[in-house]
UniProtKB/Swiss-Prot annotation:
This is Maturase K. Usually encoded in the trnK tRNA gene intron. Probably assists in splicing its own and other chloroplast group II introns. It holds the Pfam family MatK_N. It comes from the Eukaryota. It is found in: Plastid. Keywords: mRNA processing, Plastid, RNA-binding, tRNA processing. Its main location: plastid.
Amino acid sequence: MTEAFSAIHELGGIRGIGGIRGIRRSSYWQQKFLYLFLFQDHFYGIVYNSFVNESEYVRNTTIHGLTYGFNFVMLKHLMKKLHQSQSPSILFDELTNQSQFVREILMIASNPILQPRSRDSAGRINEWNGYQSIHSVFPFIEDRIHNPSNYLDITIPHCVHPEILIRICRKHILDISFLHLLRLMLHTSNHFRIPNSSNRVINLFYRFLWNFCTQSIEYCLIHLWKQIYKFQCTPFWFLFDKTEFIRKIQSVSKKSNPRPDRTISRKNCLIHYVRSQNHLILVIDGEGDFESIKDWKILFIILWSKYLHSWLDPCRISVKNLSNNPLSILGYILYTKNDLIKIRIRFFDFSINTSLVIKGFCGIIPIISLIRSLAKEGFCNTSGRPICKLSWTTLTDNEIIYRFDRIMRNIFYYYSGCCKKKGLYQLQYIFRFSCAKTLACRHKSTIRTVWKRYGSNFARNYVVLEGVKSIPSNLWQRESDEKRFWCLTITQTNFLADLLRKSKNIYSVG
């Protein structure tokens, strides 16, 4: 046992936590070291090395699941306290800092074992193309899905039974003691059963486990897709009917009653898969997409029940048509429309005009749902009438204008890919008068006084304040209502899109 600890100590001092996976697995007992060193003093050095960049000696907080600072002194004291304590209540009292550090230790210890395997699998099958921008999802849908009609809408439940997570982790972690500790923490925690808890620090640990569970399902689906659809799609426009060809052969060979072959060459189906948080979308582009979607619905239910050993509620998975049921994702409402394109076909001595009808994606701004979200945030009432933002009346004028300016910019750029942007003018009206009422309430004056001071059109053309960039007066009229453009620099979801995701009436179209 001392040899194992010495090996771990050397790896922790030289390579950090990344060296844990480099231990030789020549014997059976070397695979069961995780729980043994979990609360030892040697783990202090390993954790410290994982947070420090060896080249620049700076703190590194990019470990999966940890986005805040880590107190190593408290970690050191916690290890000593765990050695002296005889009661396990210190591990599972969620109101104490000790329990928080235990969860952080579990995330750090399981991160190099669970997370890199997913990356290795993704690199081996070469399935993912990494995009940092959220708006890159929509050009991908427009470019890849040529003839969309039906799609599979799946809602993955947030509440997963603890034993399901233990069963999945058992395939990657061979340490039985570590799994027992993980099981004990999951069963004694109430926050895991309530995923919408306000305690963000506690939810980080369960979010890490939930993401790992979801990724396991994803890679199972990818493996099935690789087995079923083995060939690459060769795009072509025409279908070859062999009937006329057989008739010509009949006239040459003079065979009696040949049986014409009416087989039609069809291109292979393409599967497009998009997931945003717990919202999963599956689209099949090809012939017979409706039958294929129904088959994949049954297959997904069977996979969920066999792999996770739990029953998926059928109401969470449904087959929808893009023409009748628009696709709602990331705060956008997408539907298909027929675009008529006029083309000219030129022959040797004449030319003809014809039309080509193609289906394309079109985005709509969910105005009704956005107004309800703004009403919850205190910018307007439920009918869309602007009100004063009372929580901002204690701020300075520059800060109030800057916040409204930033929100308007984010909303405009986030919904710049929609076909019809007339709904943005209604949001502009709400923010304009809400900002004016907030400033008037702060100075105990009227809106007319605010307009005299900053101008009646200040919400569209803010005065240049120190540290505040003004919005150009033609920003909202620069592009036509039908012209779309995607901002590929957006890396975070708009806060209104997050509110729409939680809203029940997300499919309301304004």
